[in-house]
UniProtKB/Swiss-Prot annotation:
UniProt-recorded name of the protein: Tryptophan--tRNA ligase
PANTHER family, alphabetized: TRYPTOPHAN--TRNA LIGASE, MITOCHONDRIAL
Role of this protein: Catalyzes the attachment of tryptophan to tRNA(Trp).
Residues binding L-tryptophan: D140
Gene expressing this chain: trpS
Length: 332
């Protein structure tokens, strides 16, 4: 039976967090035996932000090494750098001409991010890449014609646009693009800030105390858990009215490979101090082991990214050439 294909990328801005691991990377590791997987470091997407070249280079290698340390197997998963596969840019140009300015300017993420780019004199200089970002994302996806694309809630609208573009190409040019779906894991789909558990833990946030970074001192991470916001009830159970406690239970369940029900059972007669100690120790142990693996994998990042580039380019080139033949810019 042919395996289905999964594609996902992560921008090379900011430092990876525990939320990135639990919400995404952990699931990729579980799915790599079931799917043909293409996982990439989205360095081109990072260019819509202000960048420091030396920091960007460091982030790219760091993210790739962390993916490997978390358990991605380069024999099973194609791990590559987006900019290494030139087909992404050409595919974007083709897809850009299948969309309208109206469609792109209605994207919620564009409206949110562009509203924050205002100078002191009340003028704006919004990068055009911010507007066209969803078409590069669509190119990233359709080049590998996947069945499944795990995305966060903030990217669901972009995935819907990708599905719309695929449908349009299929109807217009008789192409065979899949309309990929996404999935949401049962536990840990969204890990929240430790200081404000109504907001997502994010690698782009300034909320340092509410965020656990995968490469930070495990002892510091333990202390952050100990100081995390809960509530005044002092009873441990998972409930929407208890976002802080629920968040800690989800972190524990995911790191210890237990169900939420099992996690609640473990802490049902415990107080919040005991809950935080249990979760804190789980986080500290996880980070200690992960960081040891990270050091081992960092040395082979360049080699693995180069191998991934070759494998990804083979698939991307094949699918792009087929599309170019269909639209008339390649001979059949």
């Amino acid at each position: 039976m042919n395996k289905k294909t999964l594609v996902s990328g992560i921008t090379s801005t900011g430092k990876l967090t525990l939320g990135n691991y639990i919400g995404a990377i952990r699931n990729f590791v579980k799915l790599q035996d079931e799917f043909n997987m293409f996982i990439f470091v989205a360095d081109l997407h990072s260019l819509t932000n202000e960048i420091v070249p030396s920091v960007l280079r460091k982030n790219i290698k760091e993210i790739a090494a962390l993916y490997l340390a978390c358990g991605l197997d380069p024999e099973k998963t194609v791990l590559f750098k987006q900019s290494d596969v030139y087909e992404h840019g050409l595919m974007q140009w083709i897809l850009l001409n299948q969309t309208t300015i109206g469609e792109l300017s209605r994207m919620t993420q564009f409206k949110d991010k562009s509203s924050k780019i205002t100078h002191a004199n009340n003028t704006e200089s919004i990068p055009s890449g911010l507007l066209t970002y969803p078409t590069l994302m669509a190119a990233d996806i359709l080049l590998y014609n996947p069945n499944l694309v795990p995305v966060g809630q903030d990217q669901v609208q972009h995935l819907e646009l990708t599905r719309k573009i695929a449908r349009k190409l299929n109807n217009k040019y008789n192409t065979k693009f899949n309309e990929p779906t996404t999935f949401v894991p049962e536990t840990g789909a969204k890990i929240m800030s430790l200081t404000n558990p109504t907001k997502k833990m994010s690698k782009s946030s300034d909320d340092i105390n509410g965020t656990i970074f995968l490469l930070e001192d495990p002892e510091l991470a333990y202390k952050k858990i100990k100081k995390s916001i809960t509530d005044s009830e002092n009873k441990v159970y998972h409930d929407p009215s208890k976002p802080g406690v629920s968040n800690l239970l989800e972190i524990y369940a995911c790191l210890e490979n237990k169900s939420l029900k099992e996690a609640q059972e473990i802490f049902k007669d415990k107080n919040y101090l005991e809950l935080k100690e249990g979760v804190g120790n789980s986080v500290k142990n996880f980070l200690t082991k992960l960081q040891a693996k990270y050091q081992e994998n960092y040395k082979r990042v360049d080699e693995i990214l180069n191998q991934g580039k070759i494998k990804a380019q083979k698939v991307a080139s094949y699918n792009l050439n087929n599309l170019m033949k269909k639209i008339g810019i390649r001979d059949k």
